[in-house]
């Protein structure tokens, strides 16, 4: 029996209905969540993502604005835009699109965000809360990985809260936006978690780690990095990679492929995600889910007249 392909689109559709219902509920109380993106330069992937989330925000009934700056903009210009959005009561969530140009400090920009509006948990306070298992917001891509895994497990008759404590989750990639948060989410579910990256590959030890995986999350940004020799029979593999490659058929088109060698891994896996159409659709909706949660929290703060602490939106299993 071949591996099951986990299509993320219907899962994203179900999540989108939940988020839309939350937006309607807030609207009935006079609250309209608002998402703002900050785009510096003309990076193709960042522009494409901005268009997607902007369209989704409009579809769900959220306010949306994109602040665009030229690549030559100074760091002070970006910080000024962030400060303006922090102060705007119509904006509940802010996403600074990456990559930023090399002359602009990501830590400086991320640290300037209002933590209550930092829906990707890049502010040091929010990143720390996530690492402590008390997240204010869970970053959208790692959240999407585990949301997809949880739904797949449930539909195959395995409660996630029973699966993870008996399983090893291996995360390939240690980026601040995917790999490291994914490790924290694995720990929050009670799994044994192994984190590895390019250093393990260069040392010739990546395979010995990935062969231990019951669930494998690959976010290395290397096309076809993981083939069947890196996985054991029955693994559940989640591919976060989005790598543009030339069509091997010679059409001249550019194709998007993941970090898994899909056909090879499918010979041994129980299930795996495609690229595109796996994690990506859920990631987009999760960003708006965080925006709506931020809008709800800011409305509560305005009514109560004070600062609120971290609400623990996704502590343990509750938020996912």
Swiss-Prot record:
Biological process (GO), any one: methionine biosynthetic process
Family annotation (InterPro entries): Aminoacid_DH-like_N_sf, NAD(P)-bd_dom_sf, THF_DH/CycHdrlase, THF_DH/CycHdrlase_cat_dom, THF_DH/CycHdrlase_NAD-bd_dom
Recorded superkingdom: Bacteria
Documented EC number(s): 1.5.1.5, 3.5.4.9
Reaction catalyzed: (6R)-5,10-methylene-5,6,7,8-tetrahydrofolate + NADP(+) = (6R)-5,10-methenyltetrahydrofolate + NADPH; (6R)-5,10-methenyltetrahydrofolate + H2O = (6R)-10-formyltetrahydrofolate + H(+)
Keyword annotations of the record: Amino-acid biosynthesis, Histidine biosynthesis, Hydrolase, Methionine biosynthesis, Multifunctional enzyme, NADP, One-carbon metabolism, Oxidoreductase, Purine biosynthesis
GO cellular component terms, A-Z: cytosol
Pfam families from the UniProt entry: THF_DHG_CYH, THF_DHG_CYH_C
Keyword Oxidoreductase among record annotations: yes
Recorded metabolic or biological pathway in which this protein acts: One-carbon metabolism; tetrahydrofolate interconversion
Residues reported to bind NADP(+): 173-175, 242
Family designation: Belongs to the tetrahydrofolate dehydrogenase/cyclohydrolase family.
Database matches in HAMAP family: THF_DHG_CYH (MF_01576)
Function: Catalyzes the oxidation of 5,10-methylenetetrahydrofolate to 5,10-methenyltetrahydrofolate and then the hydrolysis of 5,10-methenyltetrahydrofolate to 10-formyltetrahydrofolate.
Name under which the protein is recorded: Bifunctional protein FolD 2
Species in which this protein is naturally found: Rubrobacter xylanophilus (strain DSM 9941 / JCM 11954 / NBRC 16129 / PRD-1)
Gene: folD2
């Amino acid at each position: 029996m071949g591996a099951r392909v986990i299509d993320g689109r219907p899962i994203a559709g179900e999540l989108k209905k939940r988020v839309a219902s939350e937006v309607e509920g807030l609207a009935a109380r006079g609250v309209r969540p608002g998402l703002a993106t900050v785009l510096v330069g003309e990076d193709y992937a960042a522009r494409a993502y901005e268009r997607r989330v902007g369209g989704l925000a409009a579809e769900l009934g959220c306010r949306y604005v994109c602040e665009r700056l030229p690549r030559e903009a100074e760091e002070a210009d970006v910080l000024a835009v962030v400060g303006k959005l922090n102060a705007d009561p119509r904006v509940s969530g802010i996403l600074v699109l990456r990559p930023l140009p090399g002359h602009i400090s990501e830590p400086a920009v991320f640290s300037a965000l209002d933590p209550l509006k930092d829906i990707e948990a890049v502010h040091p306070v929010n990143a720390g809360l996530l690492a402590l298992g008390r997240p204010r917001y869970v970053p959208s891509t790692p959240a999407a990985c585990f949301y997809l895994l949880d739904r797949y497990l449930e539909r195959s008759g395995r409660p996630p809260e029973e699966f993870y404590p008996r399983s090893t989750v291996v995360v390939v990639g240690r980026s601040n936006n995917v790999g490291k948060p994914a490790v924290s989410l694995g720990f929050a579910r009670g799994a044994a978690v192994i984190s590895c990256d390019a250093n393990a590959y260069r040392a010739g030890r990546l395979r010995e780690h990935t062969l231990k995986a019951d669930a494998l999350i690959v976010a290395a940004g290397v096309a076809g990095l993981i083939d069947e020799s890196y996985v054991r029979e029955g693994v559940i593999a989640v591919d976060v990679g989005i790598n543009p490659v030339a069509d091997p058929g010679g059409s001249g088109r550019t194709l998007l492929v993941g970090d898994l060698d899909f056909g090879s891994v499918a010979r041994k896996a129980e299930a795996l995600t495609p690229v595109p159409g796996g994690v990506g659709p859920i990631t987009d909706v999760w960003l708006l889910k965080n925006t709506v949660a931020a809008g709800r929290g800011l409305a509560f703060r305005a009514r109560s007249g004070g600062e609120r602490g971290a609400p623990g939106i996704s502590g343990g299993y509750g938020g996912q």
